[in-house]
Amino acid sequence: MTLGKEGEPMRRYAVETIVDGTTKYYFIRDCETLEIVLLPSKYLKHKIKSKRSPNTVKRSAFSICYYLEYLEELSMDIPQVCGLDFEKQNEHFVDFLHWLKAGNHTQENKIRTINNGTCNAYLEDVFRFYLFAEAQDSRIGSLKVLSYSYHVAVNAVGVQKKLRYQSFKGYLKAEERDVRPAEQEEIITLLQACTNCRDQLLLLLLAETGFRIGWC
């Protein structure tokens, strides 16, 4: 294992970008071999080609990168995870959520606590990558812990489309937001801090509709 600053272990994988014209592509590099990790990078390119938003692709890139670090710690790879039985596979992904929650995905893990919703969103990105990997090569195998449901949506011209979405029983429980009604003095302080009439008007509208501290 390579040690970095103050003896901390260096991350095995890193998210990098390359710009082609006006399009930014994301890929994942193995920092030990300096090679591009092909399957995840192919998936990220697919998302760009599919016109997914840059922010969505960026988050997917980091989600997968974090997951690859998690696999590195376990000395496992994608096919091995697919080969686990239901119970072990479920445990694997629940442990990944707790690994994220503990801040192990970042070297600045003492700065702030990651919330449950963000952990769940990272895992959702990982599941989408698994579905892509399975579609690319059936020999990789498929996940046993995902259950699938279908929803029929109708577009603007009345054409029905059957949409499939996956669910996982092990997601972290949603946290209650720490909000409370804003006091009058707090609203006045915010109004006085505003530099233009537009922001003052927006604050007044929020105050009328039940402004909560913790929304901002």
Where would I find each of the regions flagged by the language model?
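Basic/aromatic DNA-contact patch characteristic of tyrosine site-specific recombinases
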Residues: 1-61, 65
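Short, compositionally biased low-complexity segments
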Residues: 33, 99, 162-165
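Short, well-structured alpha-helical segments
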Residues: 57, 61, 123, 200-207
